[in-house]
């Protein structure tokens, strides 16, 4: 092989290597353009063991709710992907995500369902570059995943109500529905994904407050959905007054349903425990989620753009996706609120990725 042939071969290898990302990017962009033709939140779950899951214990050492690790015997829940009706969405491309958001800060703010989604995205990104150095730090307040090579940080700030929960010497813990005093922690991110709903329905020992307060009025109890609406409106006003849409893109993580009432899918007295397939059919047979309408109403009245990750209806179908007794707490805990990983939150992040491609 002479010099010119060697030079040509090296150039060919370089161009093929360079085009690799271009091909992926083109396919990703085509997928986004296709996705704009329909409502990506309407569709069905398709069993696909050729492409899902996107990661596993070997490619994500910090999974957390790894139900396989904790003894879940079935595996079908790992292989469902979301398919919108009438269009396709781009497959999640971790390298493309990291390249697009190089040097950026992504922030999840909310409860344990936000944490579920944060860990999912961190795993999806880590699996894309498994040999890259990373940091994964869990703290009571702010937890962070970073990949220094890309300068990206994906953060989770625990805040179950978004509004203030304060301690009072005489009354205990007061949930101040019209007050946000630590919103400065939410500033400075390029993408912010907020969530609250899960904690508002808690009762008994699970309830983390003693009183509600609005203005000077303090009450022991009130309608929970009314309290939720007041708090969410407080959050919406804070966003309208403090966020610059040219610097920060804001999303609201839609209400994540629980599956404690088997009567909703034809199994009275049962829960998510033992469920191995999604609900079949075009819609969930149970009653509408109370929080979903409130979220859409509040966001619809906002001055600043907030994009709703409208995942409630699609997630209602996944009665099979919860940890149940495979969350690490043994048979005493039947968790029908959170989600196994890999699993449903990966689809949420795929839809987040699809939405982010619009810029």
Swiss-Prot record:
Query: Motif range for DCXHWCLPGXXDXWN motif?
Result: 335-349
Give this protein's Gene Ontology molecular function annotations. Answer: O-acetyltransferase activity
Which UniProt keywords are given for this protein, alphabetically ordered? Answer: Membrane, Signal-anchor, Transmembrane, Transmembrane helix
Q: Where is this motif: GDS motif?
A: 110-112
Record-linked InterPro entries: TBL (IPR029962), TBL_C (IPR026057), TBL_N (IPR025846)
Q: Does the keyword Transmembrane apply?
A: yes
What name goes with this protein?
A: Protein trichome birefringence-like 42
Q: Which organism is it from?
A: Arabidopsis thaliana
């Amino acid at each position: 092989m002479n010099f010119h042939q060697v030079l040509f071969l090296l150039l060919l290898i370089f161009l093929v290597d360079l085009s690799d990302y271009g091909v992926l990017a083109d396919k990703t962009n085509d997928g986004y353009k296709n996705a704009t033709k329909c409502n990506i939140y309407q569709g069905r779950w398709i069993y696909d063991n050729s492409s899902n899951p996107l990661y596993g214990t070997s490619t994500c050492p910090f999974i957390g709710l790894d139900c396989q690790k904790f003894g879940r015997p079935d595996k079908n829940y790992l292989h469902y992907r979301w398919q919108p009706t009438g269009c396709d969405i781009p497959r999640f491309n971790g390298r493309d995500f990291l390249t697009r958001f190089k040097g950026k800060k992504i922030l999840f703010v909310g409860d344990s369902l936000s944490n579920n989604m944060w860990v999912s995205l961190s795993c999806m990104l880590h699996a894309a570059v498994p040999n890259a150095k990373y940091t994964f730090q869990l703290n009571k307040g702010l937890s962070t995943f970073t990949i220094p090579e890309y300068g990206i940080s994906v953060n989770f700030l625990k805040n179950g109500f978004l509004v203030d929960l304060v301690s009072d010497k005489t009354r205990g813990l007061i949930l101040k529905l019209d007050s946000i005093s630590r919103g400065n922690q939410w500033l400075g991110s390029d993408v912010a994904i907020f969530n609250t709903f899960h904690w508002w329905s808690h009762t008994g020992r699970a309830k983390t407050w003693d009183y509600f307060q609005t203005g000077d009025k303090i009450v022991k109890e009130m309608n929970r959905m009314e309290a939720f609406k007041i708090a969410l409106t407080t959050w919406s006003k804070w966003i309208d007054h403090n966020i610059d849409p040219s610097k920060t893109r804001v999303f609201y993580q839609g209400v994540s349903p629980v599956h404690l009432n088997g009567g909703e899918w034809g199994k009275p007295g049962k829960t998510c425990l033992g469920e191995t397939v999604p609900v079949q059919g075009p819609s969930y047979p149970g009653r509408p989620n109370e929080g979903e309408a409130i979220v859409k109403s509040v966001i619809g009245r906002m001055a600043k753009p907030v994009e709703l990750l409208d995942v409630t209806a699609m997630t209602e179908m996944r009665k099979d996706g919860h940890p149940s007794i495979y969350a690490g707490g043994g048979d005493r805990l039947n968790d029908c609120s959170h989600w196994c990983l890999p699993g449903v939150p990966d689809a949420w992040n795929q839809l987040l990725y699809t939405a982010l491609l619009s810029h």
